[in-house]
């Protein structure tokens, strides 16, 4: 079977000219727009996206049978069944160039390892934000770049897989993500 496809940035911008392409795809799709890209996809302003992020993301994911990660402060994930969850990890220091590229690569990496799109997406979004939170705690709230986030991943993955994540992170409400809507 074919692997799911992850589409970001200019791929999303290209789709905005012909959304019917999404209906012809027979493999699972994961789209990772930021609010501006999402606005182009649905033909509204970024401000309108921000006012009704959850409903717009859920409707789009359901209408086009895709998984959608609407990036931003409190990134959210919507699935083809019309469910959504909000990720609470991450911080404002992550609003810099290349962070979305890292996230897209993480999602694709988890899919390539055999995770289904929902788990791959939830895990990647969570770890992406967690790495940003660890960097903010160690270095301060701003001034890190995408490369710093990538450098943090091996240590975080090892800690998570071995159950050695610090207790303060394991018990923090921000690090539990379930379908909420």
Please report, for each region that a protein language model flagged, where it lies by residue.
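Charged C-terminal helix
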Residues: 130-181
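Short, small-residue alpha-helix embedded
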Residues: 40, 96-127
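Glycine-rich phosphate/dinucleotide-binding loop and adjoining beta-alpha-beta core of small-molecule
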Residues: 1-89, 160-181
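Short, charged, surface-exposed loops that flank catalytic or proteolytic processing sites
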Residues: 44-52, 114-122, 140-144
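Gly/Ser/Thr-rich beta-alpha loop segments that engage phosphate groups in nucleotides
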Residues: 13, 74, 92, 99-103, ...
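Short beta-alpha connecting loops at secondary-structure transitions
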Residues: 41-42, 88-94, 104, 108, ...
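Short glycine- and Lys/Arg-enriched binding-loop motifs that mark or flank ligand-binding interfaces
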Residues: 7, 68, 86-89, 93-97, ...
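Feature representing long, continuous alpha-helical segments
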Residues: 55-58, 85, 104-105, 118, ...
């Amino acid at each position: 079977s074919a692997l799911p496809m992850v589409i970001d940035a200019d791929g999303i911008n290209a789709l905005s000219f012909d959304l019917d392409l999404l209906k012809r795809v027979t493999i699972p799709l994961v789209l990772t727009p930021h609010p501006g890209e999402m606005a182009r996809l649905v033909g509204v302003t970024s401000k309108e996206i921000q006012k009704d992020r959850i409903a717009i993301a859920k409707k789009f994911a359901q209408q086009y049978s895709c998984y959608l990660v609407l990036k931003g402060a409190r990134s959210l994930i919507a699935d083809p069944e019309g469910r959504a969850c909000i990720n609470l990890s991450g911080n404002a220091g992550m609003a810099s160039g290349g962070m979305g590229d890292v996230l897209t690569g993480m999602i694709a990496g988890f899919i390539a390892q055999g995770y289904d799109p929902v788990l791959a997406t939830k895990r990647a979004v969570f770890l992406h934000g967690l790495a940003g939170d660890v960097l903010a705690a160690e270095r301060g709230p701003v001034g890190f770049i995408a490369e710093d986030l990538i450098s943090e991943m091996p240590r975080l993955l090892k800690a998570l897989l071995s159950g050695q994540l610090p207790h303060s992170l394991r018990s923090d409400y921000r690090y539990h993500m379930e379908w909420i809507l």
